[in-house]
Amino acid sequence: MYEVLMFDGGVYRINELYELVEDIGGFVIQKTQLQVAITVTIAIPSEDRPIIESKTKELGGKLVEVPLAGTEIAVVAPTLGRHHMPHPVCDIAEHLRRYGAITVVMGLARGKGRETAQITADEMAFIEEYDAAIFVLGNFADCIMKEKVRLFEDIEVPVIVVCGPNISSLPNCEAVVCGVGRKAERMRHADEIAKLEETALAVEAAIFKRRNIIDEDPLCVHPAEVKQRVDELESVRQSLRPSPVVLHLDGLRVKVPYDQCKDMLRDIDIFGRKLGDLTTIAPSRLGGSTMIRILTTAQLQTRDNAQSSS
């Protein structure tokens, strides 16, 4: 089983870390360099963590736990207007990035008004491309409990609700974080930062639960292994979009148009098999992107059996 960690240190002798990660069968997921400082997110076999810890100490860096690394999470507000788009939405998205997640903020097209708020099938499908969704609702318990619960009742990915009133639980969501309503300023006081931590821990618990479900029928190949091959494609190397390949719990998002890269993706060699045999590849609802969903071991066996019998 792979463990995702982040190295935080300097660029001096950083190639030694890259070589060591490769030698133990791990992967470099992401690099972020700022002058002579660098952070590197790596996926390594859990049993080899002491080796990486020793090298990190030798290089004068530190290893940071990033429990949400390898996930992409949507932070959803009822609308993008200032009525529903206060600072907490952005603060939550930013705080989750410190835990290693890639986050995106989105608003619903017709979320304004307690009785008129709605979510379309396209919006639900868009949200379900992510590993989890955080719905940041308002200050009125009656509005949330009677009307706004409709917004996420049919969403299949884990949902965490963040709201102002004290609500013990809501249907169809993993957790409710109370005490964070609409605010006109940044969340920078101690009690507000504690709420950001509470939100991050709720997301971490939901992701951990989903990882355990996936481990019951493991993926036929780890997303980090696929990413390593996808990064070698010329169209991906030429992409100017930030993080052109984003890891998910069960696949990847490649920020290259589907029509441009579908054939190249399907032909990638993964341990002697084509990527198209091990995954489903489809256009993403996020414009100009492609979604790769990795088959589980059981799904791959079923597909292979069906192909051999036909």
Where are these regions (language model features)?
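Short glycine-/aliphatic-rich beta-strand segments at the starts of folded cytosolic domains
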Residues: 1-9, 38, 74-77
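Short amphipathic alpha-helix segments
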Residues: 8-29, 52
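Generic non-transmembrane alpha-helical segments
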Residues: 16-24, 55, 59, 95, ...
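Long, charge-rich C-terminal accessory regions
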Residues: 92-95, 99-261
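Helix-enriched interaction subdomains in cytosolic or periplasmic regions
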Residues: 24-55
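A short, flexible N-terminal coil/short beta segment enriched in small residues
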Residues: 61-100
